[in-house]
């Protein structure tokens, strides 16, 4: 038995109800708390490198640290900028919270796409992502969180994957890396 006979009838009935009914349909988009929370600027700083751009940031116990990427295709050294996170400096002296503390320009952190802070080692780990220097493929750059000076480079895997996101999970004393592979994302622990 073929039920194709009823198909045109149900199609016409569906079209009739869609276009000639008085039903009101509405939709809403849920907004993020970040969109509805009141924001206020707490500080402003002059630009240190006019050709660079803010690429990533993280917070340590003492500072809010920003990475200013110096160049897209070259190996110019990037700048790490520290702003005071607290109302006192590391020695207990009063400072203006969120004011400029210091900056360091010494190393190319490649694209510097992600940063995280490890309070156990007092180090910042920077995921490079794109690499202009082939020896930086798959590298994570380690920086002293108190001085912002480069300490070492850690090669993860065989260098075939570049990492563009990094986080530190204190409860597990573990880093989480995010890699962009063809058509998907991968997380490495």
Model-derived features: where do they sit?
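Structural motif
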Residues: 74-84, 133-142, 183-189
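Short coil/turn segments that connect the beta-strands within blades of beta-propeller domains
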Residues: 61-62, 120-122, 172-175
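Short loop/turn segments immediately following the C-termini of beta-strands
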Residues: 69-72, 128-131, 179-183
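Sec-dependent signal peptide cleavage junction
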Residues: 17-29
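Blade-loop segments of beta-propeller domains
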Residues: 90-121, 128
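A short helix->beta-strand "capping" segment at the edge of beta-propeller domains
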Residues: 28-50, 98-99
